[in-house]
Design a protein with these regions (language model features):
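C-terminal recognition in membrane/secretory proteostasis and scaffolding
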Residues: 359, 369-637
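Compositionally biased, proline/threonine/alanine/serine-rich low-complexity intrinsically disordered stretches
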Residues: 25-38, 301, 632-637
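Early extracytoplasmic/domain-onset interaction patches
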Residues: 30-77, 158-159
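Juxtacatalytic substrate-recognition/specificity segment
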Residues: 61, 222-348, 354, 358
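Non-catalytic architectural context of zinc metalloproteases
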Residues: 50, 62-64, 79, 84-93, ...
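Intrinsic-disorder/low-complexity, polar/charged segments enriched in Ser/Thr/Lys/Arg/Asp/Glu/Gln
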Residues: 42-44, 56-60, 69-71, 112-114, ...
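N-terminal secretory signal peptides that target proteins for export/translocation
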Residues: 1-7
Length: 637
């Protein structure tokens, strides 16, 4: 584009913005003075979870109302989920009454999370009853995912409530109670006022605080104290007592995690903190952050099995960091006044990306990962991004911007479609930032100094302090002057080729490949029942032979294999994990092509892959020509 055209375009945009501003100003000036707002209502909510093993929850609400049309919302845009994921599809049995009379209601035609109720004269409150049906398995995640088994459940309050329109979520108050199955114990950051048998009553709080305070409960609960001031604890519910039967020393790294996080940030922004850790093979597996808790869920044996502990070592640190980065400091576009206003996800490279970097660093500093385990994880992240052809058409910024429209995208074709890459790619980018800060200050400062300024003192109870892109840039410049605006614009709009490896290289290491699988990859393959051949022939395939993904431009894709097909045989022998690994390694000394018999919608084809380089797996190799900065980054402080 020629400069004259650029100047004209900029002028046109500025002038258009001026006209919009002027029009808004004129419109606002004509408005009458707004009368004093009505006092915010208090809603009572009684949840009956005694049928949680059947995966159904019953709720009754009393909502203040006046004659006319009462508009109520089912929460839609959920914090931490970054999209319109409120599971309204699992809302059932909805009924509104007043003084014993059933009231007419209708769902809004333009928004399925909004309901309009006709309230008769002289009515001051409306009773609502509803059921929430928790999915029995499936691939749904977060509060839409499976959350109950025969022995446990995690209650996300947003799934069992409605709230009246006209106020922010911070203004509407809730008095909540919960009835649990007999004998079940519970844990939550929500203050309790009383308990009688299996019924618990909670302190009146804002809707914001209620939704931010899940309840974990079950027949088998183990509580591990991590720190006294402020109180922090690990609350573990599991499907069996055996899943909780680990020596107390296993929890030492979690105590050190709390200690190292305090040193990293220099302050906390919670009154107490609960790691709500669910161990079950029958709930959705994820982590979801809250101000004073995290809802983290993994398989039943993730605590008792050392190999699985390594595989899941990054989850709790990540969700814990979110208390500072995401809950306390939050992008302005995510700091919405209620759960209906659309969120803007453009700064997820900070919200999730920086959290991923800091969570991994804390996993190293706390001892949840050894230095080698940390490096193996970093190598796998880097190699995955280095084999991500979707970067050629879709930049990092769009992986954040597009989150609301990409919810529930399948794993097939993920390497070409791209997914939530602002997690992993920004581990590499924030490592790069950390090394630049160290270089610019001759090793005096690091990302720790940024965290102190941006998310640190003073201590406070839960609150939200929004930020913008400009504040990120300005705070980085406060720590270490540099062209941070240019750096981040380049990182967010870059298309490669290849992953951003400069942070690894600046820290004294190099990404290399050899035929040896790291324990991390071995554990990943065992847990997922998959073979990770992405770095050799560009194939991710289940032990059953089902092709999960292929990487464009690599041998499997070039030969014609695609996701959804099924490998039946390898070099004429039935497909198994051992057959596949052995045949792939044998290509290094064989002149013959690797032959895969593949089923595709009832048809069989033998694909011949012209590949002769054996198995390839990523590692980090020490670069002795540079200081070992990476080891210093993950060293306990």
């Amino acid at each position: 584009m020629k400069m004259d055209l650029i100047k004209r375009t900029v002028f046109t945009l500025l002038f258009a913005n001026f006209l919009i501003f002027s029009a808004n100003a004129q419109t606002n000036s004509k408005k009458s003075v707004t009368p004093p707002a009505k006092p915010a209502p208090t809603v009572t909510l009684a949840v009956d979870a005694t049928e949680a093993p059947r995966k159904i929850f019953h709720a009754k609400l009393t909502i203040p109302a006046s004659p006319g049309t009462l508009t109520v919302y089912y929460p839609k845009w959920m914090p931490g989920e970054h999209g319109p994921t409120g599971p309204v599809q699992d809302l059932a049995g909805l009924k509104f009454t007043s003084n014993g009379q059933t009231l007419t209601w209708r769902r809004d035609l333009e928004d399925g999370w909004t309901f309009h109720v006709e309230v008769p004269a002289e009515v001051t409150s409306v009773e609502a009853s509803l059921d929430f049906i928790s999915p029995a398995g499936g691939e749904a995640m977060y509060t839409s995912g499976a959350s109950a088994t025969d022995k446990l459940t995690v209650l996300a309050w947003n799934t069992v409530l409605l709230y009246p329109a006209g106020w922010t979520s911070g203004e509407v108050q809730f008095e909540a109670s919960l009835k649990l199955p007999d004998g079940w114990k519970f844990a939550t950051p929500l203050p309790v006022t009383s308990q009688s048998g299996s019924e618990v009553k909670f302190q009146r709080v804002s809707l914001t605080t209620l939704v931010d305070s899940p309840v974990s409960s079950g027949q088998f609960l183990r509580v591990v104290e991590l720190a006294p001031n402020p109180p922090e604890e690990l609350d573990i519910v599991a499907d069996s007592p055996a899943a909780l039967n680990v020596p107390i020393e296993v929890f030492n790294p979690y105590r050190e995690l709390v200690n190292q996080a305090q040193k990293l940030f220099g302050a906390q922004h919670f009154r107490d903190y609960h790691f709500l850790y669910t161990l079950s093979d029958h709930v959705a597996h994820f982590g979801l952050e809250h101000h004073e808790a995290n809802d983290s869920r993994l398989g039943e044996r993730y605590l008792v099995d050392p190999d699985l502990r390594i595989l899941g070592a990054g989850l709790l640190p990540h969700e814990y960091v979110h208390s500072w980065n995401g809950k306390y400091r939050r992008p302005a576009g995510l700091a919405t006044p209620d759960y209906q206003k659309p969120m803007h996800d453009d700064l997820l490279w900070v919200y999730e990306g920086l959290t991923s970097y800091l969570g991994d660093v804390l996993s190293g500093r706390s001892g949840l990962r050894t230095p080698e385990e940390y490096r193996n994880n970093l190598a796998r992240i880097a190699a995955g991004l280095d084999h991500r052809p979707g970067r050629s058409w879709r930049n990092l910024q769009d992986t954040a911007d597009g989150v609301p429209s990409m919810q529930g995208a399948p794993h097939q074709w993920e390497s070409w479609r791209r997914a939530l890459d602002y997690y992993d790619e920004d581990v590499l980018n924030w490592l790069w930032v950390d090394t630049i800060i160290r270089q610019q200050t001759q090793g005096v400062k690091s990302i720790d100094d940024f965290c102190h300024v941006f998310q640190g003192p003073p201590n406070s109870p839960p609150q939200v302090k929004p930020y913008t892109f400009d504040e990120i840039v300005n705070t980085l410049n406060q720590v270490a002057p540099y062209n941070w605006r240019g750096f981040w614009i380049e990182r967010l709009t870059n298309h490669g080729p290849g992953a951003p490896l400069t942070g690894i290289e600046n820290s004294g290491w190099k990404l290399v490949y050899d035929e040896k699988r790291t324990p991390l990859i071995e554990n990943w393959e065992e847990e997922r029942k998959e073979i990770d051949a992405r770095f050799s022939i560009g194939l991710d395939v289940e032990w059953s032979g089902l092709v999960v993904d292929t990487i464009e431009g690599m041998p499997a894709a070039k030969a014609g294999i695609g996701p959804g097909m099924k490998v039946i045989a390898v070099n004429g022998k039935r497909m198994t994990k051992h057959t596949f690994h052995d045949a792939l390694q044998a290509t290094k000394t064989s002149q013959s092509p690797l032959e895969l018999l593949v089923e595709n919608t009832d048809y069989y084809t033998t694909y011949k892959l012209d590949y002769h380089e054996g198995e390839k797996y990523p590692h980090l190799l020490r670069d002795e020509s540079k200081p070992d900065v990476l080891s210093d980054i993950i060293k306990a402080k």
